[in-house]
Swiss-Prot record:
Stored InterPro entries: Defensin-like_20-28
Transmembrane residue ranges: none
Protein name: Putative defensin-like protein 25
Superkingdom in the source lineage: Eukaryota
GO biological process, one term: defense response to fungus
Length: 81
């Protein structure tokens, strides 16, 4: 029974950490720099801000990161120029 709990916990961890992986690829060789990214999804909480920062660092060569840009329809991930 304990091995089932360990397996279930490991599976949940893998699924949780793989959620952000699809966003790390830069589409069509373009840069994430200086752009809003609605495809990233919501960007309203501190956790979203940290995910956006990691996403921009991995997809933008300037190493400057990001911020969650407040918009009328909700926050968007915006990578610095």
């Amino acid at each position: 029974m304990a091995s089932l709990k360990v397996f279930s916990f490991a599976l949940i961890l893998v699924l949780t950490f793989s959620v952000d992986v699809e966003g790390y690829n830069v589409e069509s060789g373009g840069s994430l720099c200086c752009n809003n990214h609605p495809k990233f999804g919501k960007c309203n909480t501190n956790n979203d801000n940290q995910r956006c920062n990691r996403w921009c660092h991995n997809g933008c060569g300037n190493g400057k990161g990001d911020y969650c840009k407040a918009m009328s329809h909700g926050g968007l991930c915006h990578c610095y120029c």
